[in-house]
């Protein structure tokens, strides 16, 4: 029985794109499901654009996502001799030929075909040159490329695991170039040679590669190699139905962007998995084990998926579904594991207290458990939750106007409440609430004026956990200090 072997072959010309990450994820899922192997192959033949920084970024991004590989990374440039040997084999067997047509002559023919509204394909000028004609051109020093000699047939077809039967008429397939005039084999050939060497049994990739697939199938056959199973995923588009790309969308399509903006790795994996696939029901959230069980190529959508990024949207910095998924995992993950992740954020912002890992460990975990319900990313713990871990928290403009500045008397009422809190021996939620409501009664105010004003003064926020859970979490000393200083909000 043939071993199931897949590959993820990124080009190191930039960061790891979320489209590439989705491709890697689908390959990883399929390999794991079928007890197969997944190979990481860096296709670095574009020496002008390939960089070590990009290679590191891709590997780091995959590692952060938890997409592990059984082999690699292999580098395509390390196997240049294999690619040249394959090209020579095709030339020697007559399945490839030297084409001496200049770029200028090809451009002229193309323009003439356009004007005549005829096929733009290569016309086969050099397909049947005699040995004497070839020798004459070589003697004259004429440069040439190698073209694959497409065999005569009615059509070429294959069964795509997602798109179904794909059939292309022979008349639509030109004799295509496989080696440049400088002797460098093209991606089309290199990719096939590498897949043959790596014994790849399944190729899962984007639909933008489908134009190459028919040609590559011909190369597999010409090289007497088994043809892998192909599965071409529809592309991911933006909400204007344009292909998402590094050039058009910038860092928002980089995996690193989500890591740096406080996403959990599995939350992004879950989002990417659902970006073009479903199990056929309404289920959205999958553990790793559940997704490994449910995933199938046949359930990948045949139509393009939409990445709902709205540039400049002040509320959602990326697709709202991605944010919602991250929020779900933050709310529901093991609190100890969350604590470790939040620790890194607090350390980065200078908010970490070593006591949180020692005598205040219970307080620390209880606090992040209390506040996580309204947070979307790990970054929120050091920004929206800053008041729990430091004194340099920001009082947001909206709650400041709504809860504080609207009531001039709070300039005196909140410090007064602070004094009453200072005298309490029992600083429980029940007792602090009683005192706050008692003060409101004395001042003939609705309790919400005092309570909401206090919330904004001591946390900077409009909403959050129960106010008196906040009071006891912050503790008597900090509550008294912040209430006494509340008058500064009116400055």
From Swiss-Prot:
Catalytic reactions on record: tRNA(Glu) + L-glutamate + ATP = L-glutamyl-tRNA(Glu) + AMP + diphosphate
Alphabetically ordered keywords of this record: Aminoacyl-tRNA synthetase, ATP-binding, Cytoplasm, Ligase, Nucleotide-binding, Protein biosynthesis
Motif, 'HIGH' region: chain positions: 10-20
Keyword field contains Lyase: no
EC number: 6.1.1.17
Motif ('KMSKS' region): 243-247
Annotated residues for binding of ATP: 246
Primary localisation category: cytoplasm
UniProt xrefs under InterPro entries: aa-tRNA-synth_I_cd-bd, aa-tRNA-synth_I_codon-bd_sub2, aa-tRNA-synth_I_CS, aa_tRNA-synth_I_cd-bd_sf, Glu-tRNA-ligase_bac/mito, Glu/Gln-tRNA-synth, Glu/Gln-tRNA-synth_Ib_cat-dom, GluQ/Sye
Gene Ontology molecular function, alphabetical: ATP binding; glutamate-tRNA ligase activity; tRNA binding; zinc ion binding
PANTHER family named among the record's database cross-references: GLUTAMATE--TRNA LIGASE, GLUTAMATE--TRNA LIGASE, MITOCHONDRIAL-RELATED
Function description: Catalyzes the attachment of glutamate to tRNA(Glu) in a two-step reaction: glutamate is first activated by ATP to form Glu-AMP and then transferred to the acceptor end of tRNA(Glu).
Record's protein name: Glutamate--tRNA ligase
UniProt source species: Desulfotalea psychrophila (strain LSv54 / DSM 12343)
Species lineage: Bacteria, Pseudomonadati, Thermodesulfobacteriota, Desulfobulbia, Desulfobulbales
């Amino acid at each position: 029985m043939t071993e199931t072997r897949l590959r993820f072959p990124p080009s190191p010309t930039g960061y790891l794109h979320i489209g590439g990450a989705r491709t890697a994820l689908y390959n990883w899922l399929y390999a794991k499901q079928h007890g197969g192997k997944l190979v990481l192959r860096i296709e670095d033949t574009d020496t002008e654009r390939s960089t070590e920084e990009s290679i590191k970024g891709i590997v780091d991004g995959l590692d952060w996502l938890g997409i592990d590989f059984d082999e690699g990374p292999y580098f395509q440039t390390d196997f240049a001799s294999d690619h040249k040997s394959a090209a020579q084999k095709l030339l020697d067997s007559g399945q490839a030929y030297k084409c001496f047509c200049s770029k200028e002559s090809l451009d002229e023919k193309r323009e003439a075909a356009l004007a005549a509204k005829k096929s733009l394909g290569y016309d086969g000028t050099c397909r049947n040159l005699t040995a004497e004609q070839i020798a004459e051109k070589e003697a004259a020093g004429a440069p040439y490329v190698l073209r694959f000699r497409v065999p005569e047939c009615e059509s070429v077809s294959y069964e795509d695991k997602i798109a179904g039967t794909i059939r292309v008429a022979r008349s639509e397939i030109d004799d295509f170039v496989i080696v440049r005039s400088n002797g460098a084999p093209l991606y089309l050939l290199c990719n096939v040679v590498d897949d043959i060497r790596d014994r790849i049994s399944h190729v899962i990739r984007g639909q933008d590669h489908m134009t190459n697939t028919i040609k590559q199938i011909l190369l597999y056959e010409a090289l007497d190699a088994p043809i892998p199973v192909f599965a071409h995923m529809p592309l991911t588009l933006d909400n204007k139905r344009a292909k998402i790309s590094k050039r058009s969308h910038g860092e928002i399509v980089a995996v690193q962007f989500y890591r740096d903006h406080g996403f959990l790795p599995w939350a992004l994996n879950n989002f990417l998995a659902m970006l073009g696939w479903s199990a056929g029901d309404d289920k959205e959230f999958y553990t790793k084990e559940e997704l490994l069980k449910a995933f199938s190529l046949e359930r990948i959508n045949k139509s393009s998926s939409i990445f709902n990024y709205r540039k400049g949207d002040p509320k959602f910095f990326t697709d709202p579904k991605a944010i919602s998924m991250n929020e779900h995992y933050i709310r529901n993950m093991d609190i100890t594991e969350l604590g470790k992740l939040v620790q890194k954020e607090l350390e980065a912002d200078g908010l970490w207290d070593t006591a949180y890992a020692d005598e205040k460990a219970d307080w620390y975990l209880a606090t992040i458990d209390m506040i996580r319900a309204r947070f979307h990313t790990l970054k929120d713990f050091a920004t929206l939750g800053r008041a729990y871990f430091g004194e340099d928290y920001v009082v947001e403009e909206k709650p400041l106007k709504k809860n504080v500045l609207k009531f001039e008397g709070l300039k005196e009422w909140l410090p007064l409440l602070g004094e009453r809190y200072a005298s309490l021996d029992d600083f429980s939620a029940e007792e602090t609430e009683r005192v706050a409501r008692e003060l409101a009664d004395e001042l003939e105010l609705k309790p919400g004026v005092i309570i909401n004003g206090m919330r904004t003064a001591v946390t900077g926020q409009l909403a959050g956990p129960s106010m008196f859970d906040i009071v006891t979490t912050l503790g008597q000393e900090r509550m008294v200090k912040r209430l006494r200083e509340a008058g500064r909000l009116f400055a």
